[in-house]
Structures are given as C-alpha cells and as structure tokens.
Amino acid sequence: MRYDQEAGSSSHSLPSGSSSHSLPPTEDTPLLGPRTLSSQPKTFANVFIAIVGAGVLGLPYTFKKTGWLLGLLTLLFVSSLTFFCMMLLVHTRRKLESLSGFNSITSFGDLGESVCGPAGRLVVDVMLVLSQSGFCVSYLIFVATTMANLLSRGTEHILGLDAASIYLWGCFPFQLGLNSIPSLTHLAPLSIFADIVDVAATLVVMVQDVFIFLKRRPPLRVFGGVSVFFYGLGVAVYAFEGIGMVLPLELEAKYKDKFGRALGLAMGLISIMYGAFGLLGYMAYGEETKDIITTNLGTGVVSTLVQLGLAINLFFTFPLMMQPVYEVVERRLCSSRYSVWVRWATVLVVTLVALLVPNFADFLSLVGSSVCVVLGFVLPSLFHLQAFKNELSITRIVVDVLVFLIGVMIAITGTWTAVHEILTSKA
C-alpha cells in the first residue's frame, strides 16, 4: 500500500493566484502534480494499486489458523462488505454536494466534518493516524524479520537484542533522514517500484507454492474453529484497507456514473488474487506456514531476490505512508508548519511499537480489527445514515444499522482476539 492510498483526512485549497509551491504538501497533495480525469481502465488500475499491499503476505498464515475454507469465506465476506461501504461513502458525498451545489468534499475528513462537524473530522483524523502508523509498524516488522531471516543463521544476541531487533534499529537513522524530507515528490518513482514489486513477488510466490505443494502435499484443515474467525476477519480487513482513497479516486474519475463498476471489478479481481495467494501458501507448507510467507521460501536466488525486493519496497514506502500522519499532527500541533522534531518523535514511537510486537500476522489482525474496521465499516454506515436519515426506507435504515453493528462487533471481538494472540506469542 502506498502513501496516496490512505490519504484522505482533510483537504486544502489554494488561494487564487498562488502557486502550488507556496504551501507545504498535505496528505492529499498528489506526488506527481495535477492529473487529468482518469479513464475507466485507469480508474480500475488506480483502485487496484490503492488496495493491494503488504497485508497479502499474512494471508497464508491466517488460512493456517482459520482453515482454508473458512479463510476463503472470510475474504469473500470482507471484500463484499468493504465494497458496499466504499459505495456508501460515494453516495454520501454525492448527496451532500447536491445539497450545497459545490464540489467541496474531496476526502474522508471533509466528509466527516460535513456530516458530523469538527468531531467527525477529529474521529477520522485519529483513526487515520492510528491506521497509517499501524501499517508502518508492520512494514518495519517485515523488513527486520526478512533481513534477520536472510542474513542471520543463528539465534545470536548482541547487547540483549535478537537479530530482528538489531536490524530494526539499523533502519531507524535512515528512516529519520527519509522522513525529514518535507516534500516527497522525489520519492514518487518508488511508489511505482512498490506496485511492480508487489505484483511480481506475489506471482513468484504463488508459482513456487504450486511446485512445493505437488512435492509435499501436507495435511490441511478446512475449518479452524469459531474462536479464530474474528482473527481472520481482522487480517482480511487489513488486506482490503483502502477506503481512505475512494473519494479522491471517484473525484478524478472521468465517468463517475461507471465508478462503481470499476470499483467492483477491481475488488473482485483482488479477492480472487488474495484467495489464491492465501490458499496456495497454506497448501504448500501446511502447519509449517509462517506469519510472513516469504520466510518459508528458503535461501535460493529467486526467493532471496523476492524477499529483498519486498523489504526494500516497504522500507522506502514507510515515509510515503507516514505523510498523512505528519499532515494531521503538524496541522493540529504546529499550525500546519513543518516540524522535523515531530516527525522524528513519531518515527521513534513507531519503531518502539514494532519492537514490542512478536508476530507480523497477529499485528495485522490487531490493526485490521480495530482502526481499519472503524474506518472501513463503522464510519461509512454512520455517515450514510446521518446524511440520508430523512429519506431512507426502513429497509435501508436496517441495513445501515446492521453494518454499523457488525463493524462494532468485529472491532470489539477481533481486537480482543488479536491482543490475546499477541500476548500468547509474547509469553
């Protein structure tokens, strides 16, 4: 997942006659400058790029816990509900703009403020900061674990730190430098590199999984039990997280009446890819499937290149994903002024959290079950219900309330399950 995938907390307009260079970049400032309206194929591609990210790497381990059939059903349920809630945001924005007569709602935060006032924007801001920071914590865990797996063949400790912790701290000074850059325009090509590596690595891993399965054929579980259902929901929600980018993507679509079709097609294709990746990974390694599937690949040339490529990808994606966090924090604490000390302190906090998390997939489930569920299910249904409260039929009110309650239930139960898994792993 990239920086522009999650941007969407607030919007800022330029005064007339001013240049885009006269103001610091914000979370919804395009990395590559102004863009023309997107055609239908480009809209589809943008949606695909905005959603596919590092969460897919934890799906095989999740299938090991949930069982392969329950894992597939969970992915189908989450993708369908995510698509429904994305369209709720689009319909809510269109409704509010039809009442005002102005196209002033360009982000999730704008929508929250339009529906619920400053409190709505505050809630979106907080959820955005937590989700983006959570994504970056998982990135650091992946990078450190991958480097330790490739370069450290023992259980040696230095100054009481294991190999993964040493590599994590080794990333810290470089991340301070990267995150000190006020404008990330020069890092934009890395975003393209990230997308290419993600897709290529996914395909390579899936092909290897097929050959390994044909050789080993390990026993597989169909259902892992009800107790792990909410754990799987959390990881799936994390993997499909991208709702913060829906409104900007719909705004730049040339054929807005066909946006839902492009969004649905992209979600369907991503669901198939995620299901195949999770299933093949679990089929290849069975109960030996690790929390980061790439660590199962061994030390061959191809597997090493895949792991290094993904690690480098996420290392340089880190500052892009943190940009919305800096926009929110600097806007609220520093009157939107650039502050290197705020950025460094934020990177330090994210690094410390990464040190405390023992398992990659468990942390994905925690982030997905908590903040991603609130952003993806709870807030869209709440905003839609509030905006259309005087027009909805009883059936539609029941649907919105049901989605809201499902989101709250997943958030509470899934968070508890993920925390329990993390504490159990830590013990």
From Swiss-Prot:
Keywords per UniProt: Amino-acid transport, Membrane, Transmembrane, Transmembrane helix, Transport, Vacuole
Ranges in the topological domain labelled Vacuolar: 64-69, 144-157, 208-227, 284-300, 361-362, 418-427
Domain of life assignment: Eukaryota
Pfam families membership: Aa_trans (PF01490)
Keyword Transmembrane applies: yes
GO biological process: aromatic amino acid transport; neutral amino acid transport
Major place of residence: membrane
Tissues expressing this chain: Ubiquitous.
Membrane topology: Multi-pass membrane protein
Location of the region described as Disordered in the Swiss-Prot/TrEMBL record: 1-35
Protein location: Vacuole membrane
Single GO molecular function: neutral L-amino acid transmembrane transporter activity
Transmembrane segments: 43-63, 70-90, 123-143, 158-178, 187-207, 228-248, 263-283, 301-321, 340-360, 363-383, 397-417
GO cellular component: vacuolar membrane
Keyword check for Nucleus: no
Cytoplasmic side: 1-42, 91-122, 179-186, 249-262, 322-339, 384-396
Biased composition (Low complexity): 8-24
Role noted for this protein: Translocates preferentially neutral amino acids and to a lesser extent aromatic amino acids from the vacuole to the cytoplasm. Requires ATP for function.
Family (UniProt): Belongs to the amino acid/polyamine transporter 2 family. Amino acid/auxin permease (AAAP) (TC 2.A.18.8) subfamily.
Protein name: Amino acid transporter AVT3A
